[in-house]
């Protein structure tokens, strides 16, 4: 009995200490068509100082697998499951990292290509700007650009110059 009380005491203490600790900011970057050796932090001769700084001060993946289809890798990164386990592009099984972080009172946002079912705001992201299609012109856009669920028209010019 004393052992049980002792364990419960330290468990409660650990939870108390953990709740007082400052939560980390989480920035997760996934880039299509970026090879393993394209960043300086992975040994490339290409200089990528800002990404190298993020990698040096944070967590970086050193063992990962990328499928030949971009949506499969995105589904796995979002859910921690194999693409088929998560329901493929439908994401109808399991929870996304945005849903889990949202339950922990994190603010979640996604910027860029979605190329999965529905919209990112349907899967836990509180804010979204990007395009829903698999590929588009960032100069002319298409009808799938969204800002928080609303259709977004890509401007033809910015400050009088081509955008």
Please report, for each region that a protein language model flagged, where it lies by residue.
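Sec-dependent N-terminal signal peptides
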Residues: 4-14
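Formylglycine-dependent sulfatase
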Residues: 2, 18-163
């Amino acid at each position: 009995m004393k052992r049980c009380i002792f364990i419960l005491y330290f468990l409660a203490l650990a939870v108390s200490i953990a709740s007082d600790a400052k939560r980390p900011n989480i920035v997760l970057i996934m880039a299509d068509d970026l090879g393993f050796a394209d960043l300086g932090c992975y040994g490339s001769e290409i200089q990528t100082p800002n990404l190298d700084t993020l990698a040096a001060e944070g967590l970086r993946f050193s063992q990962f697998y990328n499928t030949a289809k971009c949506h499969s890798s995105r589904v796995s990164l979002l859910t921690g499951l194999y693409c088929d386990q998560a329901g493929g592009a439908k994401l109808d099984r399991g929870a996304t990292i945005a849903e889990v972080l949202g339950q922990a009172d994190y603010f979640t946002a996604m910027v860029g290509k979605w190329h999965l079912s529905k919209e990112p705001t349907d899967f836990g992201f509180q804010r979204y700007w990007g395009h829903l299609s698999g590929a588009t012109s960032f100069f002319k856009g298409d009808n799938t650009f969204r800002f928080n669920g609303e259709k977004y028209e890509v401007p033809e010019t910015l400050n009088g110059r081509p955008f």
